Amino acid sequence: MRFDTRLIHAQQPPDPLTGAVNVPIYMSSTFRQEAPDRNRGYVYSRSGNPTRAVLEAALGDLESGAGSLAFSSGLGALATLLAAYPTGSRIVSVDDLYGGTWRLFEHHRRQFGLRVDYIDMTDPASLATALEDRADLVYIESPTNPLLRLVDLRAAVALARRTRTRVAVDNTFATPALQRPIELGADIVLHSTTKYLGGHSDIIGGALAFRSAKLVREFAWLQNAVGAVPSPFDCFLVLRGLHTLGVRMRAHGKSASAVAETLVGHRKVRAVHYPGLPSHPQHRLARRQMDGYGGIVTVDLAGGRRGAMSFIQRLKLFTLAESLGGVESLVDHPASMTHASVPKKEREAHGVTDGLVRLSCGIEDPADLADDVRAALRGA
């Protein structure tokens, strides 16, 4: 089946008892057992829940993996991933990444002796050099948050395979609608299901998808032990969101393309970051590796922080808010919002300046969003 069809049918057939076409929400914390050593597959909803099981099967299928596990947030998924790496383990991470990920990496580095090296993975030679010393995990965002840099996933996996190093990819910005890292060789895929997978800004959730059944078993134990699991209702909402993921991602892409083209060349704009632009340094990689360019556009304004704030305040259709990937358009100032935990010197070294603005382009009419951006620039 093609991807859009799988979004509808890779979950569960109509309920055999009632004929309901949607997955039931099993709002139960515990389940009756036939005997102390005999049950029907579920005993306690931290360990497993029927609604969650359907979501996990669907996400595993959509990511072309052996299975997946759902969590109560993207950072909950990341925390469970890190629980597999004891003191002294070494992670080689992309240097341009979500501020919350950086914060958790740094906490584990200081408190638990985890070694984390941040490198520019747009250059495969940098990763090759980093892997000359033993590493336990290569951690990638592609596209990155917020600068939308891409990592050549096939090349990164090939380098990691030489040293038998696991590769984990945060696929939140692309989603499996646009990019499937396991098909490119990755071992683990991470999602904040809060974003495009849920798609309606009404849940908090996360997920890990895995290349092998062995990894599913290893992390299922940790999922239960750590306990950062989503509610059945949140699982249902993600399942609902998956139905429209394909059409939404195409709409997001059209909106983002219109906004990016509006920003390019404007006298108040220093740079526009969007993989769909031919001027993007990795546009050719995006065309080869992805099935679209996504709904995020990041712009560096010439007026610095003052220019960014003036622009943000003049937007009418973009709501100033954390998060991204909902049907409504949102605007974020990374330096003071999503990346506020990163020291100024460090974030600026990676390009997260005070003039940087991240636009999550929703599924409104692209022409209206372009007009809104144009008017905000005119008044900024």
Protein language model features and the residues they cover:
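C-terminal core of ALDH-fold dehydrogenases
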Residues: 3, 7-21, 306-346
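Conserved small-domain helix->loop->beta segment predominantly found in fold-type I
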Residues: 257-325, 342-348
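Conserved N-terminal alpha-helix of the aminotransferase class I/II PLP-enzyme fold
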Residues: 30-79, 84, 100-109
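Glycine-rich phosphate/pyrophosphate-binding loop
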Residues: 25-26, 33-54, 58-61, 330-355
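Short, well-ordered beta-strand elements within core beta-sheets of diverse protein domains
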Residues: 238-247, 295-302, 358-362
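PLP-dependent enzyme catalytic core of the Aspartate aminotransferase-like
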Residues: 106, 115-117, 313, 329-380
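Conserved PLP-enzyme active-site core in the AAT-like
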Residues: 68-268
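N-terminal glycine-rich, Lys/His-bearing helix-loop that initiates the first secondary-structure elements
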Residues: 1-42, 49
